[in-house]
Amino acid sequence: MSYVGETMSNLLHQTAFLNLTWGNFVMIAVAFLFLFLAIKKEYEPLLLVPIAFGMLLVNIYPDIIISPEEASNGVGGLLHYFYILDEWSILPSLIFLGVGAMTDFGPLIANPISFLLGAAAQFGIFSAYFLAILMGFNDKSAAAVSIIGGADGPTSIFLAGKLGQTGLLGPIAVAAYSYMALVPIIQPPVMKLFTTKKERAIKMENLRPVSKLERILFPVIVTTIVCLILPTTAQLVGMLMLGNLFRESGVVRQLTDTASNALMYIVVILLGTSVGATTSAEAFLNITTIKIVVLGLVAFVFGTAAGVLFGKVLCWVTKGKINPLIGSAGVSAVPMAARVSQKVGAEEDPTNFLLMHAMGPNVAGVIGTAVAAGVFMAIFGI
């Protein structure tokens, strides 16, 4: 009987119940909330489901992300090896490859002025950087946090890894993806605040057709120019444009299909679960996380406002030919931000179709956020 009792006692001590803290229960509840938002409300389900599940796993069984050095048997946890791919910036780069293979840069090529709107929206990133410095972050952690303003999860993860801010990676990634999902809620009030009803109702001329040659040359030219000026962007911009060249060349359909489907989804699973696994209670429930969430929101709002305000400038310069609403799409949440521009414009005039016009700044924002990350890496000599 003593053997049975001892066995039962050992089994009881092996359960997670006796080892969980109140913080673990809080994070488990957050994981449940994210799963609800992803499945029921369909807020970025492809990303929030794996992130939430990784969060759930690590707060029940912390050893799932333990490193080999910390493990008693010298073997790391499963998600530790996924996470190494984040630290090495492999997964974010592969995400960019897939995004490039899925992205139509036609609206940007047809209306190059969209580049300026995409650049203007990056103001939120640099304003948040200086605000983060004032809030006590060091220069590298401030840069890693401020990139959230681009509403681009992979770039946020990429820069945090490159700058050695892996301790902040979990809160940064969760904040970035959360704001991507909340674009339809956060942006409209800002857009309406800085525009008039007349401006929101402006109809833009149809975009010109883009030739196949232009589409093929675009990724080659962008890669050459951007990487010559900022070589640190080669990893992200290079992968983005390689994926797009797969798409537009028309001669490697198998590579296009693989990059935009099978590879993309595999990488999303690895990236999401490993990022979620960095959100243990000890790492996540602290004042730094609150600061990151606030700074991310400020950066995103400032970026949206800057895009809209620059859109107003272009509207004035072109004598009313550009609807300022498309400026808000300069953040790199593709295609959510462009859809929001369309929705807000349609509220004033249901016959106003802004989606394709907004896609120009939207895809420019993807390039712009990658360039902003490259600027930070160049500043810090990475």
Which functions belong to the PLM regions below?
Residues 223-307:
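Transmembrane helical segments that form the transport core of multi-pass membrane transport proteins
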Residues 108-129, 280-307, 358-362:
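Entry/N-cap segments of selected transmembrane alpha helices
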Residues 178-251:
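Membrane-embedded hairpin module used as a gating/binding unit in multi-pass transport
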Residues 1-74:
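N-terminal alpha-helical transmembrane segments of multi-pass membrane transport
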Residues 167-185, 295-303, 326-329:
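Alpha-helical transmembrane segments
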Residues 34, 57, 85-109, 243-246, ...:
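Hydrophobic transmembrane alpha-helices of secondary-active transporters
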Residues 88, 96-102, 117-127, 131, ...:
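Alpha-helical membrane segments and immediately flanking helix-loop junctions
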Residues 39-48, 67, 81-82, 102-117, ...:
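Interfacial helix-loop-helix linkers and transmembrane-helix boundary segments
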